[in-house]
Curated annotation (Swiss-Prot):
It comes from Drosophila grimshawi. It is a single-pass type III membrane protein. Pfam families: Ost4. This is Dolichyl-diphosphooligosaccharide--protein glycosyltransferase subunit 4. GO terms for biological process: protein N-linked glycosylation; protein N-linked glycosylation via asparagine. One of its GO terms (cellular component) is oligosaccharyltransferase complex. It is found in: Endoplasmic reticulum membrane. Residues 26-40 are cytoplasmic.
Length: 40
């Protein structure tokens, strides 16, 4: 069985990964938007 500690570590790692994925998505999306506006 999965212990409470293993579940806590898994959920924390998953939360950090999803948070970084959202930050990376917004960073890439903001940069591409600026470059498209500058190129016009």
């Amino acid at each position: 069985m999965i212990t409470d500690v293993q579940l806590a570590i898994f959920s924390n790692v998953l939360g950090v990964f999803l948070f970084l994925l959202v930050v990376a998505y917004h960073y890439i999306n903001a940069n591409t938007g600026k470059s498209i506006i500058k190129s016009k």
